[in-house]
Amino acid sequence: MSLVTSLTYVLPHRLLSSLARALAYSNRPATKQWLIDTVTRKFGVDLSEAQEPDPRAYPTFNAFFTRALKHGARVPDADPAALLMPADGRISQLGPIENGRIFQAKGQSFTAAELLGDAGAAAPFNNGLFATVYLSPKDYHRVHMPWTGTLRTTVHVPGRLFSVGPDAVRNVPRLFARNERLVCHFDTDFGPMASVMVGALLVSGVETVWSGVEIPRYGDRITRKDYRGKGIVLEKFAEMARFNYGSTVIVLLPPGVATLDGGLGAETSVRLGQALARRQLG
């Protein structure tokens, strides 16, 4: 375990994330430009695909980090049966949900019930599929729909804010089931689908297209919001949310509806819109 990962056990997660949020939304020219220039240089951010390629045109660091892409910079897989990759990034892990457990790394796993904060909500995904996509600081930070779905409920599960970098994934037990997260449940034409937005150290919030910014909060109460009957339908490939700093999205699918794309595996670099899985039709 690296020194940085070891330190995350004792660092004041909330305080650091609150400070990061204040900096991210600062419109002081010197502050926001120093942050933008530092991150661009350190992580090799490519703005050539951005709708706004001028780094000095962004009013805040958060506006830069959640930047939109040019039209056509990402296109969905042409196969109508393809479920789409929800984001740019790298596959952390993917595969079957076996006996209700989701693989994290060698020697590490957690249950779907822990991740979703509800054993009943996890039951339909037993023996189904999962895909965990890590968004690094250089990536496009908007998350899109793998398939058309109607929003049913969201669940805000409080927790820690460990780093979700590769070293932490390998060494922090049940990492994604311990970090704060927003669980989004959708109804689709094949049944339930869940997209889980996992927070991390320095993540200043998750912003959804239906409710705006979800700011990390103190306390340990799970908060559920019911959207049934609201008619919130998000089409395949449509934006659903964005991270106000980098983190991880986990997609859960029920059994028997899709097969994972054969070219994917742990550590595979991926782009929004490529095939994640393909429907089992007929």
From Swiss-Prot:
Biological process annotations from GO: phosphatidylethanolamine biosynthetic process
Signal peptide: none
Required co-factors: pyruvate
Modified residues (Pyruvic acid (Ser)): S247
Subunit structure: Heterodimer of a large membrane-associated beta subunit and a small pyruvoyl-containing alpha subunit.
Pathway assigned to this chain's UniProt record: Phospholipid metabolism; phosphatidylethanolamine biosynthesis; phosphatidylethanolamine from CDP-diacylglycerol: step 2/2
Cofactor note text: Binds 1 pyruvoyl group covalently per subunit.
Site annotation Cleavage (non-hydrolytic): residues: G246, S247
A UniProt-annotated Pfam family: PS_Dcarbxylase
The keyword Cytoplasm appears for this protein: no
Protein's name according to its UniProt entry: Phosphatidylserine decarboxylase proenzyme
Catalytic activity from the UniProt record: a 1,2-diacyl-sn-glycero-3-phospho-L-serine + H(+) = a 1,2-diacyl-sn-glycero-3-phosphoethanolamine + CO2
UniProt keyword annotations, A-Z: Cell membrane, Decarboxylase, Lipid biosynthesis, Lipid metabolism, Lyase, Membrane, Phospholipid biosynthesis, Phospholipid metabolism, Pyruvate, Zymogen
GO molecular function, one term: phosphatidylserine decarboxylase activity
Primary location group: membrane
Residues at the active site: D88, H144, S247
Natural source organism: Xanthomonas oryzae pv. oryzae (strain KACC10331 / KXO85)
